[in-house]
Regions:
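Short, contiguous alpha-helical
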Residues: 7, 11-25, 30-78, 119-186, ...
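Amphipathic, well-packed alpha-helical segments that form the structural scaffold of globular domains
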Residues: 22, 26, 105, 109-112
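Acidic/His metal-coordination segments adjacent to aromatic residues that form catalytic metal sites
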Residues: 2-3, 80-92, 121-130
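Helix-adjacent hinge/juxtasegments
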Residues: 67-105
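Long, charge-rich low-complexity segments
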Residues: 91-110, 182-195
Length: 195
């Protein structure tokens, strides 16, 4: 009974993080979803591609349930699972993610939390579905957080889900940012702290 509750809870949280990640693409042009937004080249559509590949591998291959399509190379020298070629469309990548999630969902539904798996690239490769599900949830949530920050840097939009988004008060945000900046400068002695 507790296993069913735990599985349902983890799966629901995973679905929320998946939705948040994909939502970060909404309303952006092709350039903004693809361009590198960090010094390491992190980009919004690449995060979705990376998570699609991760779900297909961790909640597919690891449990002897290979994804039925070819997958991008995994952690290769050029990071091909982290960025999108000019020939790959937004729709293709989002559809790939949805198919990978559906495949992963079947694994979650059909296997018990103590189902054994094998992650050959981990130091302790013998795993259970519970541990892998926690890992996938953690990784998806982390990347959804990356996407949230990247999106905020592009157009100021923040939040977890579209239905919870509130219009931005740009004046209040600017005032808050100025206070934080002033405090940071005061901390290093560059300006006196305001009280």
């Amino acid at each position: 009974m507790i296993d069913d509750f735990a599985k349902d809870c983890l799966h629901e949280e995973l679905n929320d993080s998946r939705a948040a990640l994909v939502w970060k693409l909404d309303g952006l042009c092709e350039y903004d979803i693809r361009r590198p937004l960090t010094v390491t080249g992190t980009n919004l559509l690449g995060l979705v591609k990376h998570r699609a590949t991760g779900e297909a591998r961790y909640l597919g291959e690891v449990f002897g349930r290979p994804f039925p399509e070819p997958l991008p190379r995994w952690q290769d020298a050029d990071g091909s699972d982290h960025w999108v070629t000019a020939a790959e469309t937004r729709e293709q990548i989002v559809d790939f993610y949805r198919r990978a999630c559906a495949h992963a969902d079947a694994t979650i539904r059909e296997l018990p939390l103590d189902a054994p798996g094998h992650v050959p690239w981990w130091p302790r490769p013998h795993v259970k579905l519970f541990g892998v599900l926690v890992h996938v949830l953690q990784d998806t949530t982390r990347h959804a957080g990356h996407a949230d920050i990247l999106r905020e840097g592009l157009d100021g939009r923040t939040g977890v889900l579209a239905e919870q988004e509130r219009p931005a008060d740009t004046a209040a945000r600017a005032a808050h940012r100025a206070v934080v900046e002033q405090t940071a400068l005061a901390a290093i002695g560059a300006v006196p702290e305001r009280r």
